[in-house]
């Protein structure tokens, strides 16, 4: 089953890759690793999930934003492998930044929205190392930003 079909079965659609917001590239491939710049919860039709967890947004809102960020990571992976998903060896690492109030402490539960999607799609190849970090703000007031390292053949 293709990644696109698996996403469809989950009620999700793989978006087009988003251009960078600044003076950087969306990914760099080096020695079989692809380093993917931070991806936010940007919607396919424009707009994004914005705000701070603990200030009107809850864990479920954050997990949905993390899942959307993961979809945008997948769009960059697809660009890097030329749509040949067989080249993806595994998801190696995620670092999730969570826009949250000082008293919000459920950062791992939020970033699970991304981690669980990768496992649902790729099984063991989707399991990865990870950090989940709370921050005072993010670009564009995003709820979550996630960067990734993936291995390709």
In which residue ranges do the predicted regions lie?
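Short, polar/acidic, helix-capping and beta-turn segments at strand->helix junctions
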Residues: 1-153
